[in-house]
Curated annotation (Swiss-Prot):
Keyword Metal-binding in record: yes
E.C. designation(s): 3.1.6.19
Family: Belongs to the metallo-beta-lactamase superfamily. Type III sulfatase family.
Protein name as catalogued: (R)-specific secondary-alkylsulfatase
Impact upon substituting H317A: 1300-fold decrease in kcat with (R)-2-octyl sulfate as substrate
Residues binding Zn(2+) 2, per UniProt: D183, H184, D310, H355
Role description: Alkylsulfatase that catalyzes the enantioselective hydrolysis of secondary-alkylsulfates with strict inversion of configuration, leading to the formation of homochiral (S)-configurated alcohols and nonreacted sulfate esters. The substrate spectrum includes a range of linear, branched or cyclic sec-alkylsulfates. Can use sec-alkylsulfate esters bearing aromatic, olefinic and acetylenic moieties. Acts by cleaving the C-O bond, resulting in inversion at the carbon.
CDD domains in the cross-refs: arylsulfatase_Sdsa1-like_MBL-fold
Source organism of the structure: Pseudomonas sp
Signal peptide: 1-28
Keywords: Hydrolase, Metal-binding, Signal, Zinc
UniProt xrefs under InterPro entries: Alkyl/aryl-sulf_dimr_sf, Alkyl_sulf_C, Alkyl_sulf_dimr, Bact_Alkyl/Aryl-Sulfatase, Bds1/SdsA1_MBL-fold, Metallo-B-lactamas, RibonucZ/Hydroxyglut_hydro, SCP2_sterol-bd_dom_sf
Amino acid sequence: MSRFIRASQRRTLLATLIAATLAQPLLAAESLDSKPASAITAAKNAEVLKNLPFADREEFEAAKRGLIAPFSGQIKNAEGQVVWDMGAYQFLNDKDAADTVNPSLWHQAQLNNIAGLFEVMPKLYQVRGLDPANMTIIEGDSGLVLIDTLTTAETARAALDLYFQHRPKKPIVAVVYSHSHIDHFGGARGIIDEADVKAGKVKVFAPSGFMEHAVSENILAGTAMARRGQYQSGVMVPRGAQAQVDSGLFKTTATNATNTLVAPNVLIEKPYERHTVDGVELEFQLTLGSEAPSDMNIYLPQFKVLNTADNAPPAMHNLLTPRGAEVRDAKAWAGYIDASLEKYGDRTDVLIQQHNWPVWGGDKVRTYLADQRDMYAFLNNRALNLMNKGLTLHEIAAEVSKLPGELDRKWYLRSYYGALSTNLRAVYQRYLGFYDGNPANLDPFPPVEAGKRYVEAMGGADAVLKQMRAAIDKGDYRWAVQLGNHLVFADPANKDARALQADAMEQLGYQTENALWRNMYMTGAMELRHGVPTYDSRGKSEMGRALTPDMFFDLLAIRLDTDKAVGHDMTLNWVFEDLKQDIALTLRNGVLTQRVGSLNPKADVTVKLTKPTLDQIAARKLDLPTAIKQGTVKLDGDGKKLGEFFGLLDSFSPKFNIVEPLE
């Protein structure tokens, strides 16, 4: 068996969960309600207060400096739905940490609550806290140069509106995408017109490889990343001291909003490039393969300001993000930071970033960058040192408990976003892969089969529950969660197993310093108690319009149901008349491949259309039969083959189970 369970089991599970909400909290029927911090958790969090310099308020001064207009309200979409809500986090302000939150994380969450329009210096502004990312606004001779357009059209418009309430209204003459993550380009269409970009009226700068990586990350593995991203950001969890408080580099992600993408018209290809736009001097430093595959820093010589994008935020970053992505190169990352320090350190008075707040003062900037460099170099070198001594990825994570020397006491290197243990595992994965070399781990059972065997070996469900309760009583929540995971995957209808595992996950969430870990624990606990939320807050995405035809067919190859497609061999020619581009698709052995710039003379059918027509069909604004009837799609050959082909495609839903077997 796999992680899948039958629909009948799922119905039984739902019935038992409903019944459990009516039950008394007896030992045999664990409560589904959220719990307070245990005495063990409260004591552990109190201990944190003794070990970190909480009297140091320098970062609060840095975060508040230059504040023109605070923001603590909501952003809504055209339908009146809430997209962004800073008001939900006001419980954090001017209060000591609750015992259900690690005090260090509470400290970071309070800093991320400082939102609004800020003046970095005359003619240079930032909007922070209206989106996961910052919008940096530079006033040129006659217009504005923007660095990053935030995640959504709605938040981008709101950020620019806030700026215009306090500064002269000038046209946007240029946009810079610092890198290929959606929170830095997804709002573009909300504030610039694509026609102006195509006409050259607005310059859009981006690092080399931007479109390939922006689209591949958000489209090809998009559904899986989106679902895992719900766990990482805690977006489905309520806000509060017993729920979601922060995401380390920002508060959470936007909901009910529109992701867009306007293709750049200026690509930065050289390691260092200088451009001047509307009197604003921009010096770009390519940092490909650092925090993103397509990435760059921006130096502003007129201001003596270095913008390190997401390459040196005031928290440890992820070498392998929990939502899923390509593993990042810590050695290269450290090298890029050192190159920035060497080239710009003596010429920089202020360091700004596309998350969080600035670093003020040249000496502090130089120390900050050196510390950031040392941290990523340590992660790489220490993991390699230990793996060459024979330690495996989990052993390495257990061996290294803190950063060396003074690094461990620097607020801006704490594990609020990336975590020390997961980053060390990521380095291991980069060099050696997921397999630890032990043949016992070469071909493990999948979770359902493993769970059943473990439960049987331990003497049955009651014996496992007894062990879980004993572990919880001792504060050994990690062990309780591991035991519970086996039991839930063996028997997802076991309400006591679900409740106990949720309780243990919740206590781990209360204890962790890492915001993403907390969000994942809280989301897991919520879904164990109540199931996967049925509502959809994803909003709309216009990312599909940015797909080139070959990217679109890559996506179809992923969506193809191989089991259904076997025995349906065919060839399909596609002619994009506006692009002057031909593509031949071959379906063979249940596998779809393509040849760009080629047509098969023996194709079953040839499809002629334009890229805008494909965009409409892909967005489900136009169906294929209507397009054929209208003449916007022309067929030559056996048209039934086209319908047969589309009938072989899967659809994906970002509501699949994670903490229990798939349905």
